[in-house]
Curated annotation (Swiss-Prot):
This is ATP-dependent Clp protease ATP-binding subunit ClpX. ATP binds at residues 119-126. PROSITE patterns: CLPX_ZB. The gene is clpX. One of its GO terms (biological process) is proteolysis involved in protein catabolic process.
Length: 423
């Protein structure tokens, strides 16, 4: 087809579909004995887009992975946290099953938003990201500490939906099938059990602002970002279809739970004194009840909007070593792939992996701190390696992690000599 701007001689050309002349439209495209204008092309595009959305607003029943399949995928990327993975798999499956059946069901199904409780670096954010990637739905993260009530300086809670829309090019239907992860949710807890008479811009007030968004409302979002103003056209997003996952470390929550559990167990010389070895912190956190979260500082209405609670354990040394080498995207595999691009083999010895895990434990950063340790150890080598010829292998051992030596470089001729000598 060709772009026609003029007819033969002075005779004007007309769009075969709408009848407009070439002078009334921007472009007129010619085919064999027919013409179509740019306006009709745009209209056809809109019709096709609408048709596609109607055909597949939510994946078919066969396409929605069952809880066991979701759990299996999480196992490929996340080490440990078995109960949390089970809880998440069921909650996510039920959420998308609810979206599919909402029109057919006589009984209205409630939302199953999720609260993840676990120490820093235990995998809360990574679990949410992995789920969204597996389900192929839009995903965005927000930091609860940056949120404020409407009218105050800071981020409105509706900015969360704005970010989700940005992730899917402002496709409202796609956004309504998305997952939102709100981190540091424990940081907006009320500082005491008694409601404050002063305004709490980033605490209880934000909880109140998040209530409707998480439960389900039609949020009016400006498409171009920024604060709302009357001249803007708003996009209407139904948040009842969006899955919200909130996460936080909840430091000190174990003491609140212990206090509840110890009530009525007796005091004085005959009372049993529980040591830390008898009741580990992870086991205590797993016994969390809504009343504990209220005492911690979350308002009851907000807790009610997060009916599914999953607790994550603090990662021990063995778990960190597994994280370094077992998952599909394990750090050692990632760095090995980088070195392979230079035709160099990278080897982490067992004592090196243990030393990295111990370092992360000492820093109390969990899995989150592993990458910075490995990056720091390999930085010098990655800087020099592209300029050095003949390197076949790089070996990292315990002394390298301790900073006592540099990674060992083995050259191609050294390897040949070793192989020839039978070593």
């Amino acid at each position: 087809m060709t772009d026609q701007s003029k007819g033969d001689g002075d005779k004007p050309l007309y769009c075969t579909f709408c009848g407009k002349s070439q002078h009334e439209v921007k472009k007129l495209i010619a085919g064999p004995s027919v013409f179509i204008c740019d306006e009709c092309v745009e209209l056809c595009n809109d019709i096709l887009k609408e048709e596609i959305h109607q055909l597949s607003p939510v994946p078919d029943q066969d396409e929605l992975p069952v809880p066991k399949a979701i759990r299996k995928h999480l196992d490929d990327y996340v080490i440990g946290q078995d109960r949390a993975k089970k809880v998440l798999s069921v909650a996510v499956y039920n959420h998308y099953k609810r979206l599919r059946g909402s029109a057919k069901q006589e009984v209205e199904l409630g939302k199953s938003n999720i609260l993840l409780i676990g120490p820093t670096g235990s995998g809360k954010t990574f679990l949410a990201e992995t789920l969204a990637r597996y389900l192929d739905v839009p995903f965005t993260m927000a930091d609860a500490t940056t949120l404020t009530e409407a009218g105050y300086v800071g981020e409105d809670v509706e900015n969360i939906i704005q970010k989700l829309l940005q992730k899917c090019d402002y496709d409202v239907e796609k956004a309504e099938r998305g997952i939102v992860y709100i981190d540091e949710i424990d940081k907006i807890s009320r500082k005491s059990d008694n409601p404050s008479i002063t305004r709490d811009v980033s605490g209880e007030g934000v909880q109140q602002a998040l209530l409707k968004l998480i439960e389900g409302t039609v949020a009016s979002v400006p498409p171009q970002g920024g604060r709302k103003h009357p001249q803007q056209e708003f996009l209407q997003v139904d948040t009842s279809k969006i899955l919200f996952i909130c996460g936080g470390a909840f430091a000190g929550l174990n003491k609140v739970i212990e206090q509840r559990l110890s009530t009525g167990t007796g005091i004085g010389f005959g009372a049993e004194v529980k040591s830390k070895t008898q009741s580990e912190e992870g086991a205590i956190i797993a016994k969390v009840e809504p009343e504990d979260l209220v005492r911690y500082g979350l308002i009851p209405e907000f807790i009610g909007r997060l009916p599914v609670v999953a607790t994550l354990d603090e990662l021990d040394e063995e778990a960190l070593i597994e994280i370094l080498r077992e998952p599909k995207n394990a750090l050692t595999k990632q760095y090995s792939a980088l070195f392979e691009m230079e035709d160099v083999e990278l080897e982490f010895r067992e004592d090196a992996l243990r030393a990295i895990a111990k370092k992360a434990m000492a820093r109390k950063t969990g899995a989150r701190g592993l990458r910075s340790i490995v990056e720091g150890v390999l930085l010098g080598t990655m800087y020099e390696l592209p300029s050095i010829e003949g390197v076949a292998k790089v070996v990292v051992d315990e002394s390298v992690i301790a900073g006592e030596s540099d990674p060992i470089l083995i050259y191609a001729n050294q390897q040949k000599n070793k192989q020839a000598s039978g070593e």
